[in-house]
From Swiss-Prot:
Comp. bias regions, Basic and acidic residues: 337-351
Protein name per Swiss-Prot or TrEMBL: Zinc finger BED domain-containing protein 6
Organism field: Homo sapiens
Superkingdom assignment: Eukaryota
Gene symbol of the encoding locus: ZBED6
Amino acid composition bias (Acidic residues), ranges on this chain: 359-373
Role, per record: Transcriptional repressor which binds to the consensus sequence 5'-GCTCGC-3', transcription regulation may be tissue-specific. Regulates the expression of target genes such as: IGF2, PGAP6/TMEM8, ENHO, and PIANP. Acts as a transcriptional repressor of growth factor IGF2, thereby negatively regulating postnatal growth of muscles and internal organs, especially in females. Negatively regulates myoblast differentiation and myoblast mitochondrial activity via its regulation of IGF2 transcription.
C-alpha cells in the first residue's frame, strides 16, 4: 500500500489539543519525508498519536510552545494517514476537494476538518494502491465519480462496479476489447512495465498518427510513391503486414510474457501455457484451452498448479518435455532431440495455423512401447493418487462438456442463434430451455450466460475480423470505396457503420456452371456507437481510425465515400479530403417527402390511411372481421403493411395494401367509429400510387448488388420519361388534380440540389461512359450543356494517370501478345512497349523504364487512342446479366489500363443497401431490444450479423471450451441475481 502525504501548517493550538482532537479518529503518524525544500524544513523525527493523550505526560513548558520545535527550530509537520485505506477508491467526496480544505482561512479548522473528513467519510486517495493492471495505461479515475474510469482514447466514462462494492477492471478490459481492440492487443503483446513510461501504440502506418493516440488519415497525391508501394515494395511490407494482421487475434494464440515487469519465465510449463489476457492470475493451456489458476490475484503467482495440470491431464506431453529438457546434459541421441523439437513446434504451431493439437494417440503411433511405459511411471510419481484422481475426474467432466463433438455442435448452434436471431443471452438460461436441452441432449452442459457474453461471441467476433482482414490483403485493385451510415435506434446513441466495397475479377468459372458471377464484394468494417451530440471531428476521427486500421496496412486507398446528406457526416468527409458521393436512395426519399409535405390533401389522406392501418394492427377483433370478409368473398389476403416514419417506400406499400383491400376495408370501417376514408381520399390514393410506381421500380433496381454509379443518370432520365408519360395519360383522361401532382413532382425531380449535383458530377458521368450498355446513347442521359468530348478527355486523363503510376500492369504477356486476336485491339501504349522488345519476344527492361519515366504528354495520345477504340467498338448483348463488369473482365488483357479505370468507377455503389436491409426490415434492432443488451457487445453482434453470411463463415471451425466447475458457480450466481 502506497503512502500519500498531506502537508498541513501548524496552527496556534498546542500539541496536546491537536492530539486530543485526533485521538478519536485513528492512528496519525508524522515521519520524515524527503522533498524539494531545504533540509531544515523537513521533519526528521517520527511522532505517532495512537489515540492516547501523551501530551498530558509532557512538562508544562513544552505545552506552552506555539508549535513543534525540533533541534531548536520551528518546523512544518507532515501528516501521514496511516489508517488502512481500501484498495479501491471510495464513494465519498472526490479527492479534488482536499486542496480546498488546505486553502481554508482558519488553520485550526483546516487541520481538524481535513483529518476527520478523510477518516470518517473515507475519502480514498488515488495513490493508495499501485495500479498494476495494464488497463490503467488507457484509463484514469473519474474525478467526479470515483467508481468510474474515463478512457484516454475515446473519453468515455465506464463503470467499474457499484459504489461501496469491489471495483474491478473487467468492464474496462471489455471496453478496450470492443472499442479499441488494436490498442489493447498490441498493449498485451508488447506490454507496459510498472513504473515505466506510459505506453504508446507504435503502429507503422502510411497515414500519420494523431496526437490523441488515434489514427489520422492523410490522403496523398494519386501519383505518390505510396500508392505504388503495393506493386513495387510488396516484399518490404511483408513484415508490416504480418505484424498488423495479428492485431485481430486475441485468442487461440500462444502469447508469452503478456504481463510486463515480471521475471523471465524459465519454467518448462510455459512451453504449454500462456498468460490469460483477461485474467493475469490464470494461464491458458495450449493443448486443451483450459484456463488454470496460478494463485489469488495480488499474491504470489506460481507454476505448481500448471505442473499438476500437465501431469494429470497431459502426462505424455509433460513427460516428453521433461525428458527432452535434459537431452543435451544426459547425452541423448539426436533422434530424441528431433522428437523434442517436433513436439515443441507442434505445441507452438497455433501461432500461425490455429488449433492443431498433438494428442496421446499421435505420439503412440510414432514412439515405441518402452518410452511410453517410462513416461507413465514418471507422470504418476510427482502427485498423490487422491489428487490425481480428482484432477482426472475434472478433466473427464471437461472432456464431456467440451470435447464431445455433439456438445460442440450444440454450443455452436446456440451462438449462431444468438448472432443471427439476436436472442438475448438470458434466453438460454431460462428453465424452459434447460428442460428442453435435458430432453434433447441429457449429457450436454449448457454454458453460462457470462460465458457467451465474455468468451464465445468475442471469439467469433475476432475470427470474423481476421477473415475480413486477410481478404482485404488479397484485393487486387488499389482503390476501393466506402459507405458511411449513421442510424438512430437508441435514445442516446447513434450507430456509425463503415462498409468497404471492392471488385474481384478472379471469378471466371461462371462459363462452366452457367451462373452469373458475383464480382462485387463488400464487408462491414465497424459498427461503433457515437453520442448524439458527437461533433464533426469525432466522426472524422472514427473514419480515419478505420481507414488506418483496415486499409492502410494493405495499401488500399478510399476513392469515393457514399453517405446521406447528414451535415455532420458530409462535412467530416469533405474535411478529411475525401470525395463525397450522395446516396441515391436518400435523394429520392427527400424529393418524395417534400412532395408529400407540399400538398395538404396528400397529408390529410396519409393521416387517415395511417389511422386505418393502426386500427387493424392493434385490434384483434377488427382484423378478424376483415379476414372473415375476405374469406367469404374469396378475396386474396396479404399481410398488413405498416408505415415507417421517414421512409417513403413504406408509405407506398401501405397505400398499395389499402387499395388491394379497399372493398373489405371500406366495409369493415363502417362499424368502427372515428376511422373514415372518404371517396375523394380513395381516389387521391390511387393517383399517388400511380405516380410513385416508377420510383418504386427504380428503388428495386438500385437495391441489387450489381447497381453502381453507372445507373444514376439513366435512372433519373427514366423517371422523367415515366412522369411525362403519366402526364400525357392524365391529360387525355382530363384529370386536373393528377396533372398538378405530376407536374409538381417532375419539377422537384429536375430542380433538386443533390440530384442536380449528381447529374453533373464527374464520377457519375465517367461511370456512365464506362458502361457499354449506355455508351451509344449518352446524349439522352447527359444534362443540358454537357459536352461528350470533354468527358472523353477526362476519361483519357484517368487512363493516362493509371499508365504513369502502374506501367508494369499495362504490359501484355508474351503468350497473349503472340495471339492475333489480342494484338488487334491492344493498347497503343502497350504497342509502344512491344516495339522495345528484344528478338526473343521478351520486353526490354530499359525500354519499360524509359517509358515509365517519360512525360505525361507521351502517354496521353496513347490513352486517347484507347478511349476512342472503346467507343468505336460495337457492343452486342450477351448472356450474363446487366453487370458491365462481365464485359470488362473479357477486356482486361486487351485494354488493361482502361479496364482498371472502369473497375474503379463501376464498383462504387449508389447507396448503402446493406445497412438498409438490417435496420429497416429487421425487427431485432428496436430500441428496447438494444437497450436490454450490453452496449459494447451489441456492436459486436451487429457486426457479426451483417458479415457472417457475406463472408460464408463456417461455425464448425469455432473452437469452444470452458471450465465446468467454474461454469456451475457462475450459473448459480446468475440465478441469485435474477428475480
Amino acid at each position: 500500500m502506497s503512502v500519500c502525504t498531506l502537508s498541513v501548517p501548524v496552527s496556534s493550538l498546542s500539541p496536546g489539543r491537536r492530539c486530543n482532537t485526533f485521538s478519536d479518529s485513528g492512528i496519525l503518524g508524522c515521519v520524515p519525508i524527503n522533498s524539494n525544500t531545504d533540509e531544515e524544513d523537513v521533519v526528521e523525527e517520527k511522532m505517532v498519536a495512537e489515540g492516547v493523550n501523551k501530551e498530558a505526560k509532557q512538562p508544562a513548558k513544552k505545552k506552552r510552545k506555539k508549535g513543534l520545535r525540533i533541534k531548536g527550530k520551528r518546523r512544518r509537520k507532515k501528516l501521514i494517514l496511516a489508517k488502512k485505506f481500501s484498495k479501491d477508491l471510495g464513494s465519498g467526496r472526490p479527492v479534488a476537494d482536499a486542496p480546498a480544505l488546505l486553502a481554508s482561512n482558519d488553520p485550526e479548522q483546516d487541520e481538524e476538518s481535513l483529518f476527520e473528513s478523510n477518516i470518517e467519510k473515507q475519502i480514498y486517495l488515488p495513490s493508495t494502491r499501485a495500479k498494476t493492471s495494464i488497463v490503467w495505461h488507457f484509463f484514469h479515475v473519474d474525478p467526479q465519480y470515483t467508481w468510474r474510469a474515463i478512457c484516454n482514447l475515446c473519453e468515455k466514462s465506464v463503470s467499474r462496479g457499484k459504489p461501496g462494492s469491489h471495483l474491478g477492471t473487467s468492464t474496462l478490459q471489455r471496453h478496450l476489447q470492443a472499442r479499441h481492440s488494436p490498442h489493447w492487443t498490441r498493449a498485451n503483446k508488447f506490454g507496459v512495465a510498472s513504473g515505466e513510461e506510459d505506453f504508446t501504440l507504435d503502429v507503422s502506418l502510411s497515414p500519420s498518427s494523431g496526437s490523441n493516440g488515434s489514427f489520422e488519415y492523410i490522403p496523398t497525391d494519386p501519383l505518390d510513391d505510396n500508392r505504388m508501394g503495393k506493386k513495387h515494395d510488396k516484399s518490404a511490407s511483408d513484415a508490416l503486414r504480418a505484424e498488423r494482421g495479428r492485431f485481430l487475434i486475441k485468442s487461440n494464440i500462444v502469447k508469452h510474457a503478456l504481463i510486463p515487469g515480471t521475471r523471465a519465465k524459465t519454467s518448462a510449463v510455459w512451453n504449454f501455457f500462456y498468460t490469460d489476457p483477461q485474467h493475469i492470475s490464470r494461464a491458458v493451456c495450449n493443448i486443451c484451452k483450459r484456463s488454470v489458476s496460478r494463485g489469488r490475484p495480488g499474491s504470489h503467482l506460481g507454476t505448481s498448479t500448471l505442473q499438476r495440470h500437465l501431469q494429470a491431464t497431459h502426462p505424455i506431453h509433460w513427460a516428453v518435455a521433461n525428458k527432452d529438457s535434459g537431452a543435451v546434459a544426459n547425452g541423448l541421441d539426436e533422434a530424441e532431440t528431433e522428437r523434442s523439437d517436433l513436439l515443441s513446434d507442434t505445441l507452438h504451431g497455433e501461432k500461425s495455423t490455429g488449433s492443431q493439437d498433438l494428442t496421446a494417440e499421435d505420439l503412440s503411433d510414432s514412439d515405441s512401447d518402452e518410452p511410453m511405459l517410462e513416461v507413465e511411471n514418471r507422470s504418476e510419481s510427482p502427485i498423490p493418487v487422491a489428487e490425481q484422481g480428482t484432477l482426472m475426474r475434472a478433466q473427464e467432466r471437461e472432456t464431456t462438456c467440451c470435447g464431445n463433438p455433439v456438445s460442440s455442435h450444440i454450443s455452436q448452434a446456440i451462438i449462431q442463434m444468438i448472432v443471427e436471431d439476436m436472442h438475448p443471452y438470458n434466453y438460454f438460461s431460462t428453465p424452459a430451455f434447460q428442460r428442453f436441452m435435458q430432453i434433447v441432449a441429457p449429457d450436454y452442459r449448457l454454458p453460462s450466460e457470462t460465458y457467451f457474453f465474455t468468451k464465445a461471441v468475442p471469439q467469433l467476433y475476432d475470427c470474423v475480423r481476421e477473415k475480413i482482414f486477410l481478404t482485404l490483403e488479397n484485393v487486387q485493385s488499389q482503390k476501393i470505396h466506402l459507405t458511411v451510415d449513421i442510424w438512430t435506434h437508441d435514445p442516446s446513441t447513434d450507430y456509425f457503420i463503415v462498409t468497404v466495397h471492392w471488385v474481384s475479377l478472379e471469378t471466371a468459372s461462371f462459363l462452366n456452371n452457367g451462373r452469373i458471377p458475383d464480382f462485387r464484394k463488400w464487408a462491414v468494417l465497424c459498427v461503433t456507437g457515437l453520442a448524439k451530440d458527437c461533433l464533426i471531428t469525432n466522426i472524422l476521427q472514427e473514419l480515419n481510425d478505420q481507414i488506418g486500421l483496415w486499409l492502410s496496412p494493405n495499401f488500399l486507398i478510399p476513392s469515393f465515400i457514399v453517405s446521406d446528406n447528414s451535415s455532420n457526416v458530409v462535412h467530416a468527409i469533405k474535411d478529411g479530403g475525401f470525395t463525397h458521393v450522395p446516396c441515391f436512395l436518400h435523394c429520392l426519399n427527400m424529393v418524395i417527402q417534400d412532395f408529400f409535405c407540399e400538398h395538404k390533401s396528400i397529408e390529410n389522406m396519409l393521416v387517415a390511411a395511417r389511422k386505418t392501418c393502426h386500427h387493424f394492427s392493434h385490434s384483434v377483433k377488427a382484423r378478424q372481421i376483415l379476414q372473415e370478409f375476405q374469406n367469404d368473398h374469396q378475396l386474396p389476403w396479404k399481410n398488413l403493411k405498416q408505415d415507417e416514419t421517414g421512409h417513403w417506400i413504406s408509405t407506398f406499400y401501405m397505400l398499395k395494401w389499402l387499395l388491394e383491400h379497399c372493398y373489405s376495408v371500406h366495409h369493415s370501417l363502417g362499424r368502427a367509429s372515428g376511422v373514415v376514408l372518404t371517396s375523394l381520399q380513395w381516389t387521391l390514393m390511387t393517383y399517388v400510387c400511380d405516380i410513385l410506381k416508377p420510383f418504386e421500380e427504380a428503388t428495386q433496381k438500385v437495391s441489387v448488388k450489381t447497381a453502381g454509379l453507372n445507373q444514376v443518370l439513366p435512372l433519373i432520365h427514366h423517371l422523367l420519361l415515366s412522369l411525362q408519360k403519366l402526364r400525357e395519360d392524365f391529360q387525355v383522361r382530363g384529370i386536373t388534380q393528377a396533372l398538378n401532382l405530376v407536374d409538381s413532382l417532375s419539377l422537384k425531380l429536375e430542380t433538386d440540389t443533390l440530384l442536380s449535383a449528381m447529374l453533373k458530377s464527374k464520377p457519375c458521368i465517367l461511370a456512365t461512359l464506362l458502361d457499354p450498355c449506355f455508351k451509344n446513347s449518352l446524349e439522352d442521359f447527359f444534362p443540358q450543356g454537357a459536352d461528350l468530348e470533354t468527358y472523353k478527355q477526362f476519361l483519357a486523363e484517368e487512363v493516362c494517370n493509371y499508365m504513369e503510376s502502374s506501367p508494369e500492369i499495362c504490359q501484355i504477356p508474351t503468350s497473349e501478345a503472340s495471339c492475333p486476336s489480342v494484338t488487334v485491339g491492344a493498347d497503343s501504349f502497350t504497342s509502344s512497349l512491344k516495339e522495345g522488345t528484344s528478338s526473343s519476344g521478351s520486353v526490354d527492361s530499359s525500354a519499360v523504364d524509359n517509358v515509365a519515366l517519360g512525360s505525361k504528354s507521351f502517354m496521353f495520345p496513347s490513352a486517347v487512342a484507347v478511349v476512342d477504340e472503346y467507343f468505336k467498338e460495337k457492343y452486342s448483348e450477351f448472356s450474363g446479366g446487366d453487370d458491365p463488369l462481365i464485359y470488362w473482365q473479357r477486356k482486361i488483357s486487351i485494354w488493361p489500363a482502361l479496364t482498371q479505370v472502369a473497375i474503379q468507377y463501376l464498383s462504387c455503389p449508389m447507396c448503402s443497401w446493406q445497412s438498409e436491409c438490417i435496420f429497416t426490415k429487421n425487427s431485432h434492432f428496436h430500441p428496447k431490444q438494444i437497450m436490454s443488451l450490453d452496449f459494447d457487445n451489441i456492436e459486436q453482434l451487429m457486426f457479426l450479423k451483417m458479415n457472417l453470411k457475406n463472408v460464408n463463415y463456417d461455425y464448425s471451425t469455432l473452437v469452444l471450451s470452458w471450465d465446468p466447475e467454474q461454469n456451475e458457480v457462475v450459473q448459480s450466481s446468475e440465478k441469485e441475481i435474477l428475480p
